[in-house]
From Swiss-Prot:
Keywords: Ribonucleoprotein, Ribosomal protein
Swiss-Prot/TrEMBL GO biological process terms: translation
Matching InterPro entries: Ribosomal_bS21 (IPR001911), Ribosomal_bS21_CS (IPR018278), Ribosomal_bS21_sf (IPR038380)
Single GO molecular function: structural constituent of ribosome
Region (Disordered): 23-57
NCBIfam families named among the record's database cross-references: S21p
Alphabetized PROSITE patterns for the sequence: RIBOSOMAL_S21 (PS01181)
Name the UniProt record assigns to this protein: Small ribosomal subunit protein bS21
Presence of keyword Metal-binding: no
Organism ancestry: Bacteria, Bacillati, Bacillota, Bacilli, Bacillales
One of the record's GO cellular component terms: ribonucleoprotein complex
Cited PANTHER family: MITOCHONDRIAL 28S RIBOSOMAL PROTEIN S21, SMALL RIBOSOMAL SUBUNIT PROTEIN BS21
Record flagged with keyword Ligase: no
HAMAP family on file: Ribosomal_bS21 (MF_00358)
Length: 57
């Protein structure tokens, strides 16, 4: 989990912006979206090969 310390004389907006940036870097929201619904390994492989095929063209 991203953790920041609010600096002296720092506004709440800038602290919130720093927190959002740190959480985006750590990938918390991406991991949450990925784990929201279970996906079978065979489906993952199929999606990965489809994405590779799309990139190729």
């Amino acid at each position: 989990m991203a953790e920041i310390r609010v600096k002296k004389n720092e506004s709440l907006d800038s602290a919130l912006r720093r927190f959002k940036r740190e959480s985006a870097k750590s990938g918390v929201m991406a991991e949450l979206r990925k784990r929201r619904h279970f996906e079978k390994p065979s489906i993952k492989r199929k999606k990965k090969s489809e994405a590779a095929r799309k990139r190729k063209f």
